[in-house]
């Protein structure tokens, strides 16, 4: 029995199962934990099906979502895996980014082939930027005819190509999650093959620390005799003292300045890193030149915009959302990072109105510029109450 070493240095990757209801996403998730537990018991606890199926509810940007989080390790990597029990939970998770995915395992039952939710999940994966997909062709123990399996595989590949994934190159692995869970050696091997494919095909993500510096401003104050300080949580990158930065968003003009001090918990630091809450002392900047809602960035790394296309989920009445549909020219607030900005909504051709509980594409024109990139998340609010959540899929202007 090979004993795998636990290494903190193992690369960490976020993954999730997507696909049509009853195609076996949760069974596969349980099977992965069992197979890896049997292979490397000191690294992997086994998480049974019913524990994953009764996923706890989480609140993300005011939306309640059931998400099951499981962790496991292959020889090469450490994975955090998300599985959602209900279809609506998937849609909400993917749009709000409650659990970010560096890659997804698309589960398709060989007995059915691609179904409506298979398509919806693949489309959403494309729109919200899930970069890589590996296919688990599940329940293949129930299909005796090789030709049928080949046809289903072809259909899945065509579907992926249609939504701009590399359908010809994506690994498609034939598995039986249920039989693997029962301990059948042949199907246990199939799950290990699937994990090998994920190890190989889904690249390591670029860590937040290695990306260009960005910090949303939460608060601004003046320290007498020293100057203006902005505080916030560093979203990504690192920042050293005496580095030049740019402050953008909300106003037309951008402010260039140098950070002369970085403070955390009243201590001075040489550098601030992604995930830390810090105060930045800015040279020659007046208190009234900066405000909450702007961002401090590495100069030129991000630009402010007012028009974008987005994919959004609108809360149902039961979730505390609107009780009535909205129409063209709807004017809610869009909450980006730390602030609300009013925007005007244009609906896609053929969509007359959007009902509570729907997900929809939309075009938005903001009244003030916001520092944004594709993939940026936002909440849709009316007077401080969250009525929806979404993310930028394309910047228009």
Curated annotation (Swiss-Prot):
Region G1, residue ranges: 19-26
Chain spans, region G3: 83-86
An annotated GO cellular component: cytosol
Region (G4), start-end ranges: 138-141
Principal location listed in the UniProt entry: cytoplasm
Region (G5): 176-178
Positions annotated to bind GTP: 19-26, 83-87, 138-141
InterPro entries: EF-Tu_GTP-bd (IPR041709), EF-Tu_GTPase (IPR050055), EFTu-like_2 (IPR004161), EFTU_2 (IPR033720), G_TR_CS (IPR031157), P-loop_NTPase (IPR027417), Small_GTP-bd (IPR005225), T_Tr_GTP-bd_dom (IPR000795)
Catalytic activity: GTP + H2O = GDP + phosphate + H(+)
Keywords linked to the UniProt accession: Cytoplasm, Elongation factor, GTP-binding, Hydrolase, Magnesium, Metal-binding, Nucleotide-binding, Protein biosynthesis
Quaternary organization: Monomer.
NCBIfam families registered for this protein in UniProt: EF-Tu, PRK00049.1, PRK12735.1, PRK12736.1, small_GTP
Record protein name field: Elongation factor Tu-2
Gene that encodes the chain: tuf2
């Amino acid at each position: 029995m090979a004993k795998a070493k636990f290494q903190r240095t193992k690369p960490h990757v976020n993954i999730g199962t997507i696909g049509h209801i009853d195609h076996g996403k949760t069974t596969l998730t349980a099977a992965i934990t069992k197979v890896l537990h049997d292979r490397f018991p000191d690294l992997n606890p086994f998480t049974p099906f019913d524990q994953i199926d009764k996923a706890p509810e989480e609140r993300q940007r005011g939306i309640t979502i059931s998400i099951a989080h499981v962790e496991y390790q292959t020889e090469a990597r450490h994975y955090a895996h998300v599985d959602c029990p209900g279809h609506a939970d998937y849609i909400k998770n993917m749009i709000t980014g409650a659990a970010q995915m560096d890659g997804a395992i698309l589960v398709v039952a060989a007995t059915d082939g691609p179904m409506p939710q298979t398509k919806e999940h693949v489309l959403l994966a494309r729109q919200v930027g899930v970069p890589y997909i590996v296919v688990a062709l599940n329940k293949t123990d129930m299909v005796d005819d090789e030709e049928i399996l080949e046809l289903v595989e072809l259909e899945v590949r065509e579907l992926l190509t249609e939504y701009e994934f590399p359908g010809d190159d994506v690994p498609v692995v034939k598995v039986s999650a249920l039989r693997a869970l029962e301990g059948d050696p042949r199907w246990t091997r199939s799950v290990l093959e699937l994990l090998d494919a994920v190890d190989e095909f889904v690249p390591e993500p670029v860590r937040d620390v290695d990306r260009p510096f960005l910090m949303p401003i939460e608060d601004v104050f003046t320290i007498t005799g020293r100057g203006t300080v902005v505080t916030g949580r560093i979203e990504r990158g690192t920042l050293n003292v005496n580095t030049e930065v740019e402050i953008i968003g909300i106003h037309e003009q951008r402010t260039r300045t140098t950070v002369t001090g970085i403070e955390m918990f009243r201590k001075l630091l040489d550098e601030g890193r992604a995930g830390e809450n810090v105060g930045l002392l800015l040279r020659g900047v007046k208190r009234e030149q900066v405000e909450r809602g702007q961002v401090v960035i590495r100069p030129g790394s991000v630009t402010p915009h007012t028009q974008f296309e987005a994919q959004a989920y609108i809360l149902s009445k039961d979730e505390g959302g609107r009780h009535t549909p909205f129409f063209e020219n709807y004017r809610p607030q869009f909450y980006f990072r730390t602030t609300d900005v009013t925007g005007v909504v244009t609906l896609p051709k053929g969509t007359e109105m959007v009902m509570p509980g729907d997900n929809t594409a939309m075009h938005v024109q903001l009244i003030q510029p916001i520092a944004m990139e594709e993939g940026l998340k936002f909440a849709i609010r009316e007077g401080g109450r969250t009525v929806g959540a979404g993310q930028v899929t394309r910047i228009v202007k």
